[in-house]
């Protein structure tokens, strides 16, 4: 099953000093079905890694080049943000409790739409947020 990498995983892959850098690289090396990115995860990665407040800040151009190189790999697919979060079959708004959960729920819905799994470092994502999501649609790296 192809994997949509969330922003936290992309950051860990690009930041050699990130605590989860080795874990994410080991996981990626075993991923045989390929991986995907989307505008939300790419923009989030660029924004966070290039912020002056980020502990291992990288110049924006360096982050962009790193992502471009990774995306050139034949195992990569780019997915446009194509889920309507307000559609009746997408997010379960009754189960979302905090605004901070919306992006994670959206990314999970995008993975479900592509019959893929969302790969994250975030242990707080609930399958109940997305209609049709099963355990196969979410992988938390720990």
Residue ranges and their predicted role:
Residues 34, 75-77, 136-139:
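Conserved beta-strand segments of alpha/beta enzyme cores
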Residues 113, 117-119, 123-142:
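Charged phosphate-binding loop/patch that engages nucleotide di/tri-phosphates or the phosphate backbone
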Residues 41-42:
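Short, conserved alpha-helical segments within structured domains
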Residues 73-123:
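Active-site neighborhoods of divalent-metal-dependent phosphate/nucleic-acid chemistry enzymes
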Residues 1-37, 49-65, 130-133:
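Short, well-structured N-terminal submotif of metal-dependent ribonuclease cores
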Residues 53-55, 97, 136-138:
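Short, hinge-like loop/turn segments at secondary-structure boundaries
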């Amino acid at each position: 099953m192809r994997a949509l990498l969330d922003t936290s995983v992309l950051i860990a892959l690009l930041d050699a000093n990130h605590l989860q850098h080795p874990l994410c690289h080991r996981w990626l090396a075993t991923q045989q079905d390929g991986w995907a990115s989307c505008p939300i995860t790419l923009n989030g990665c660029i924004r966070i890694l290039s912020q002056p407040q980020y502990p291992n800040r990288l110049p924006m151009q360096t982050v962009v080049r790193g992502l471009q190189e990774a995306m050139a790999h034949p195992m990569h697919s780019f997915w446009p943000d194509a889920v309507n979060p307000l559609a009746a079959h997408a997010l379960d708004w009754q189960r979302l409790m905090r605004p901070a959960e919306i992006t994670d729920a959206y990314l999970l819905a995008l993975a479900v739409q592509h019959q893929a799994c969302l790969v994250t470092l975030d242990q707080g994502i609930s399958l109940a947020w997305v209609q049709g999501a099963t355990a196969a649609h979410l992988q938390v790296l720990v």
